Amino acid sequence: MSWQAYVDEHLMCEIEGHHLASAAILGHGGTVWAQSADFPQFKPEEITGIMKDFDEPGHLAPTGMFVAAAKYMVIQGEPGAVTRGKKGAGGITIKKTGQALVVGIYDEPMTPGQCNMVVERLGDYLMKQGL
């Protein structure tokens, strides 16, 4: 299966009648492996900050997490594995695997729990595949 198929079929899938606003799979250095059509472009320093938060949980909490210059308030996650952010009626979930970052961005009416489920399920699958 291609990386694009993972995004199209597993991240942008319908969940209880709703879809993510955008999604992508990136390498740890920020290289885009596959993305939805309207996924925002990360700046290199944003990826650096996110990766540092995985290595040093809580690093982004004081400043927030930035994605394409949009600021997300960092909310609960799983240290070293999942970072979550909230911005208005939407938010973001990022799951770190051995080689990739699985990213989902949502807006209402999709819920944070639905976004978490979609992103983390694919991330867990990729980890089991050694990725």
From Swiss-Prot:
Q: Which CDD domains match?
A: PROF
Q: Name one GO molecular function term.
A: actin monomer binding
Q: Name one Pfam family in it.
A: Profilin
Record PTM text: Phosphorylated by MAP kinases.
Tell me which SUPFAM superfamilies the record gives: Profilin (actin-binding protein) (SSF55770)
Entry keywords, A to Z: Actin-binding, Allergen, Cytoplasm, Cytoskeleton, Disulfide bond, Phosphoprotein
| More info | The variability of the residues taking part of IgE-binding epitopes might be responsible of the difference in cross-reactivity among olive pollen cultivars, and between distantly related pollen species, leading to a variable range of allergy reactions among atopic patients.
Question: Is Transport given among the entry's keywords?
Answer: no
Q: Where in the cell is it found?
A: Cytoplasm, Cytoskeleton
Q: Which residues carry this modification: Phosphothreonine?
A: 111
Q: Which superkingdom is the protein from?
A: Eukaryota
User: Where is the motif Involved in PIP2 interaction annotated in this sequence?
Assistant: 81-97
What is the protein's name according to its record? Profilin-6
Q: Which family does it belong to?
A: Belongs to the profilin family.
Q: Share what the entry says about its subunit structure, partners included.
A: Occurs in many kinds of cells as a complex with monomeric actin in a 1:1 ratio.
Give the source lineage, highest ranks first.
Eukaryota, Viridiplantae, Streptophyta, Embryophyta, Tracheophyta
Disulphide connectivity of cysteines: 13-115
**Function of the molecule:** Binds to actin and affects the structure of the cytoskeleton. At high concentrations, profilin prevents the polymerization of actin, whereas it enhances it at low concentrations.
Please provide, in alphabetical order, the Gene Ontology terms of the cellular component aspect for this entry: cell cortex; cytoskeleton
PANTHER family according to UniProt: PROFILIN (PTHR11604:SF31)
